[in-house]
């Protein structure tokens, strides 16, 4: 994932990474420490303070969502190529690409070379973002023509009335109750917190960002707000 530096940071230890405000960093690991991430910039990697950066939210990144949950969500999509990227369950620190095709969901391991570049087959990329953009027009599969397309925001139906999906760019909700994550990939928050919604295609669980963390949360714990942030 990518992050934008909010402030300058000068390394004070050999394993830290210096950067300037506005730099775009590649976050390699969000689990090293609750206050520090491991990141890469200009071919160098090291630890950075998490409160100095702002994660770039992407509707296709679902973090530690289980493979079965990915298949359930993508199975509801109408179009081939609907996809998400998640952290690998079998190989911590790696990523998997899950894509709907026909009645199935295919899974691709995102590989990395010694220089830290990402790839599925031959063409390599500096970030997951670049990999995703490339495979919107170049098939992710060698056997079928599968082009990535964003998950569709499906309006939900309640009691016979069709409720319009929340507006995009961006949508915020406010927490009605505290929520403590019970599984990997869930987003914790406190009552009153504002959460940016990045995916609301599932009727029960939405994906959002709060305090630079991204994950899934129960829809009935929040209420929509009109807020420009």
UniProtKB/Swiss-Prot annotation:
UniProt keyword Cytoplasm, yes or no: yes
Domain SH2: 60-152
Principal localisation: nucleus
Impact noted for substituting residue 49 to L: Unable to reinitiate oocyte meiosis
Residue ranges of every copy of the SH3 domain listed in the record: 1-58, 168-227
Compartments in which it is found: Nucleus; Cytoplasm; Endosome; Golgi apparatus
One term under GO cellular component: cytoplasm
Molecular function in Gene Ontology: epidermal growth factor receptor binding; insulin receptor substrate binding; phosphotyrosine residue binding
Family: Belongs to the GRB2/sem-5/DRK family.
UniProt name for this protein: Growth factor receptor-bound protein 2-A
Gene source species: Xenopus laevis
């Amino acid at each position: 994932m990518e992050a934008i530096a909010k402030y300058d940071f000068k390394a004070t230890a050999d394993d830290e990474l210096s950067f300037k405000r506005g730099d775009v960093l590649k976050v390699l690991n969000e689990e090293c420490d609750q206050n520090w991430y491991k990141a890469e910039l200009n071919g160098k990697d090291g630890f950075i303070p998490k409160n100095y950066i702002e994660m770039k939210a992407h509707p296709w990144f679902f973090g530690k969502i289980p493979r079965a949950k990915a298949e359930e969500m993508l199975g509801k999509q109408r179009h081939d190529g609907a996809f998400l990227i998640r952290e690998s369950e079998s190989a911590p620190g790696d990523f998997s690409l899950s894509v709907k095709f026909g009645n199935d969901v295919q899974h691709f391991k995102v590989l990395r070379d010694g220089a830290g570049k990402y790839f599925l087959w031959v063409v390599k990329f500096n970030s997951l973002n670049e990999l995703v953009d490339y495979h919107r027009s170049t098939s992710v599969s060698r056997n079928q023509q599968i082009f990535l397309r964003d998950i569709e925001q499906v309006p939900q139906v309640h009691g016979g009335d069709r409720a319009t999906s929340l507006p995009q760019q961006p949508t915020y909700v406010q927490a009605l109750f505290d929520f403590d994550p019970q599984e990997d990939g869930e987003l914790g928050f406190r009552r009153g917190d504002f959460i940016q919604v990045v995916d609301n295609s599932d009727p029960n669980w939405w994906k959002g960002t709060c305090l630079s963390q991204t994950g899934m949360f129960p829809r009935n714990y929040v209420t929509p707000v009109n807020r420009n942030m």
